[in-house]
Amino acid sequence: MARSSAVCFLLLLAFLIGTASAITCGQVDSDLTSCLGYARKGGVIPPGCCAGVRTLNNLAKTTPDRQTACNCLKSLVNPSLGLNAAIVAGIPGKCGVNIPYPIRMQTDCNKVR
């Protein structure tokens, strides 16, 4: 009995670890740090910003990762940060990256696949 309980626990743990998102908001912030000046004032988009956008896009391959990235990106368009929401929303396109959802506060990240 104890052995079967242990096996069930390990299977549950493996399932939970396997479905957990590998991307964190810390990772998103790190990848997009070089975008902050551009997101405040516009101008010329820094090459490092586009490199970070591409890196983040390449990391977000699973549904949980995309949903986490979506929620993290939504936090960037929060008016209290002083970033221009329209500029933030346009960064992926300016970098030639197509993401499957708009970056805006109203986006329902639970629907991102």
Swiss-Prot record:
SUPFAM superfamilies (UniProt xref): Bifunctional inhibitor/lipid-transfer protein/seed storage 2S albumin
UniProt family annotation: Belongs to the plant LTP family.
UniProtKB keywords: Disulfide bond, Lipid-binding, Signal, Transport
Signal sequence extent: 1-22
GO annotation terms (biological process): lipid transport
Record protein name field: Stigma/stylar cysteine-rich adhesin
Taxonomic path: Eukaryota, Viridiplantae, Streptophyta, Embryophyta, Tracheophyta
Positions of disulphide bridges: 25-72, 35-49, 50-95, 70-109
Function, as annotated: Acts as an adhesive agent between the pollen tube wall and the stylar transmitting tract epidermis. Binds a stylar pectin in a pH-dependent manner. Enhances activity of chemocyanin, a diffusible chemotropic factor.
Name of the gene encoding the protein in the UniProt record: SCA
Top-level division of the source organism's lineage: Eukaryota
GO molecular function: lipid binding
Tissue note: Highly expressed in style and stigma, abundant in young leaves and petals, and low expression in young anthers at pollen mother cell stage with an active tapetum. Not expressed in mature leaves or in pollen grains or tubes. Found in the stylar transmitting tract epidermis and in the stylar extracellular matrix.
